[in-house]
């Protein structure tokens, strides 16, 4: 898990010291609730834990936006809801734009703006703000 989250920091345009990487990864593990899993292999994690690792990895280099393609697609309803709550809280806290693709209307309803598509064209736009 640790190395999985560290990878984007090693290849980022900005150079991070070992101390900076340690601080960033420790904070991300805490924010996604995986402090106790830092030495685990992804194969030993549940689907929800793997998604949380992916979120932490995406946040490692402080992006302006996160793009998610079906972030809850392989998860049960309860875990999917938890993942969406985590995503929304993290992007709100860090001021990051979240763009996601989903076929789940319940997940779409958690977003501020929804674009419905059919045949590659936007057929409807809804905005809650």
Predicted ranges, named:
Residues 41-45, 49:
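Conserved ABC ATPase signature
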Residues 55:
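Hydrophobic anchor residue at the start of the ABC signature
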Residues 66-69:
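Catalytic Walker B motif of ABC-type/P-loop ATPase nucleotide-binding domains
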Residues 3-19, 31:
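ABC-type ATPase nucleotide-binding domains, specifically the catalytic core motifs of the NBD
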Residues 2, 38-41:
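Signature (C-motif/LSGGQ) region and adjacent switch/coupling loops
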Residues 60-64:
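A short, proline-enriched helix->beta-strand linker immediately N-terminal to the Walker B motif
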Residues 77-79:
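Helix N-cap at the start of a conserved alpha-helix in ABC-type nucleotide-binding domains
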């Amino acid at each position: 898990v640790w190395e999985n989250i560290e990878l984007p920091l090693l290849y980022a345009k900005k150079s991070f010291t070992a101390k900076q990487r340690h601080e960033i990864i420790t904070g991300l593990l805490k924010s996604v609730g995986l402090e106790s899993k830092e030495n685990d292999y992804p194969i030993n994690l549940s689907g929800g834990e793997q998604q949380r690792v992916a979120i932490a990895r995406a946040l490692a280099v402080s992006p302006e936006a996160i793009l998610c393609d079906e972030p809850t697609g392989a998860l049960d309803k309860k875990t999917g809801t938890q993942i969406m709550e985590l995503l929304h809280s993290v992007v709100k806290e860090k001021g990051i734009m979240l763009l996601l693709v989903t076929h789940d209307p319940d997940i779409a309803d958690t977003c501020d703006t929804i674009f419905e598509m059919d045949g590659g064209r936007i057929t409807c736009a809804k905005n809650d703000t």
